Amino acid sequence: MKKNSFMLSFLIVLGCDERNPVEVHKAYITLQGQDKVAVVDINAGEVLHYVDVDFTNTGDMPHFVVIDETHNYWYCTLIASGYVLKFDLQTDELVDSVHIGNMPALMALDEEREYLYISRFMPMMGMSTSSQLVHKIDAQNMTIIGTVNVGADSPHGIALSSDGETLWVASNQASHFFKIETDRFGDTSYQPQNFRIGTDVPSSYEINDGFYNALELELSHDDSELYVSCSNSMEVRVFDTESGDSLNTIMTGMMPWHIQLSKDDSELFVSNRMGSSVTVVNLISGNINTLTDDSMSILHGCALSANDDLLLVTSPGSGNAYVFDIENKTLLQTFGFSDVSDTDPMPTGAAIVQ
């Protein structure tokens, strides 16, 4: 009887093990060169499948991705064809789309109110005219419900306050950033408050000085500090969101690109485009570490997992994406996408399901 009870217990445990494999941890990576979005498992290091975003059959170039876990959708910008696409988070099927116009770049998502804010970037290699526009989209029905003209060329970096009332946007060409009241979208007379990134640049935001080339913005989780990656000056600058005053300057690798803050605001992660490395800054102690791999070349996006233990980094130069263990500062996974198509994959945007 005891032997039979032992065997029954063993089979139950074995059955439970088979039913509960290592949890799939899904992430999305835009492959700008292949008109696809890779859906990957960052725990197993496996590509689950590819989502075709060849929306117009003319080369759409998916650039950036954000996830709405509250309503189970994800969104992707197509910088070449000017669309923003909406997908079902469970099935990865296309739900809806909206045409924005030339170069929709980065997005900020207000999950509670279901609004998307889209920055319109500069044209690539003179393909079209520069934009000065930021759009507000009703994500429920994918319609543009308002636009703000910041007055400066190539708005790119974008960050939304936790209450959804303030949108921060930085020009990539003029060394200014803007504080936009989100309820003023659609008001053609509205000019948002602007701040200079440095005292050494023109006071006018209409001058494309190109001194700092701001790339991405991140807000601290209490909304008190704004982090600005300055790709031309190889630094991240930190500003007070009440006064716009400069609080700190953090030196990085060559050409800092996308940035992420840990949930407790204790660490800053910076993908260095030409430095082919990730700078990790302890904002409490000031200590700086570097994450890198010999195969890395021309970095772009980065994304943190829910508990900040994993960092996903994209590398258009190598055609790969990388997953690092933050605590041990070791490389865990490398994703290659070159076998999907003859064209270079150019992984850019990255987002992890939390």
Summary of predicted features, one role per range:
Residues 5-13:
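Sec-dependent N-terminal signal peptides
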Residues 16-354:
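Predominantly soluble domains enriched in secretory-pathway, periplasmic, or organellar proteins
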